[in-house]
Amino acid sequence: MASQLTDAFARKFFYLRLSITDVCNFRCTYCLPDGYKPGAVNNNGFLSVDEVRRVTRAFSALGTEKVRLTGGEPSLRRDFTEIIAAVRENPAIRQIAVTTNGYRLARDVERWRDAGLTAINVSVDSLDARQFHAITGQDKFHQVMDGIDAAFAAGFDKVKVNTVLMRDVNHHQLDTFLAWIQPRRIQLRFIELMETGEGSDLFRRHHLSGMVLRDELLRRGWIHQIRQRSDGPAQVFCHPDYAGEIGLIMPYEKDFCATCNRLRVSSVGKLHLCLFGEGGVDLRDLMVEDEQQAELEARIAEALTHKKQTHFLHQGNTGITQNLSYIGG
């Protein structure tokens, strides 16, 4: 077995974000405002179930404990349940999560659970149905809310909800969000709006630092929790009067990258060392046969030697990320 993935800055990597499609049926203003547009034609299409099985097996041999399936919208894959099961085959992977817009959650969550899914993140940027429609381009607010209820009914102890923090859109709705999570085991994660190649104007108009919310939470008696090694980048806060939690993801904060523990593989098999990195390292030619696993592990480990210390977002560097559906956010 190869050694634990570690980069030149002594960061260890336990967490893989694996995109399985860049297709999405929502048109969120901060991601795909004009809807999904196919990229360059790729005869191989998106990663197959067997390719997913091989790449996650290689990462697990290198110490990966958590795999998050992302998109686009991953549940648009007809074989999504089989993909979950393929990852679940590997006992070294302790957590299998999905980030979803939630529109198929009510219908399919029990099947996903039975296939091996252990955690769910749902994107909800407003608790007002009309504003939700305006942000996403889809009139599916109640369907998504029913999906979250279905996840709890299916036995998920906690559901994470991702909310992109936007000035003059939802930043003033903190009290509404807090009332929603008070009786529910929801970890509500406010994510700072990030500048992408296609979203510079939106960023200038709507970016708000998560520190504004952080200061308000601390003022109200919320307590900062200690981060676990396979956790994502959120700073998590709890309060004795609330069943739910608040998470803040602030990529522009000083030292945000110091605790990076995650790598990304795109839906066409490229390894991305950073959400805002350049190019990517092609792994797909080593996902063809089971016998290539040692070579695949070696290429992943070698690529990690090139991971930079920080994303340089502060300098306005958005890398190749034209929109966040490209490599799964």
From Swiss-Prot:
Residues binding [4Fe-4S] cluster 2, per UniProt: 257, 260, 274
Bound cofactor: record note: Binds 2 [4Fe-4S] clusters. Binds 1 [4Fe-4S] cluster coordinated with 3 cysteines and an exchangeable S-adenosyl-L-methionine and 1 [4Fe-4S] cluster coordinated with 3 cysteines and the GTP-derived substrate.
UniProt record, GO biological process: Mo-molybdopterin cofactor biosynthetic process
Positions that bind S-adenosyl-L-methionine: 30, 72, 123, 194
Keyword presence, 4Fe-4S: yes
InterPro entries hit by this protein: Aldolase_TIM, Elp3/MiaA/NifB-like_rSAM, MoaA, MoaA_NifB_PqqE_Fe-S-bd_CS, MoaA_twitch, MoCo_biosynth_MoaA/MoaC, rSAM
Binding of [4Fe-4S] cluster 1, residues: 24, 28, 31
SMART domains named in the record: Elp3
EC number: 4.1.99.22
Pathway: Cofactor biosynthesis; molybdopterin biosynthesis
Pfam families according to UniProt: Fer4_12, Mob_synth_C, Radical_SAM
Sites where the protein binds GTP: 17, 68, 99, 160, 262-264
PANTHER family: GTP 3',8-CYCLASE, MOLYBDOPTERIN COFACTOR SYNTHESIS PROTEIN A
Role: Catalyzes the cyclization of GTP to (8S)-3',8-cyclo-7,8-dihydroguanosine 5'-triphosphate.
Binding partners and assembly: Monomer and homodimer.
Record-given protein name: GTP 3',8-cyclase
Source organism per UniProt: Klebsiella pneumoniae (strain 342)
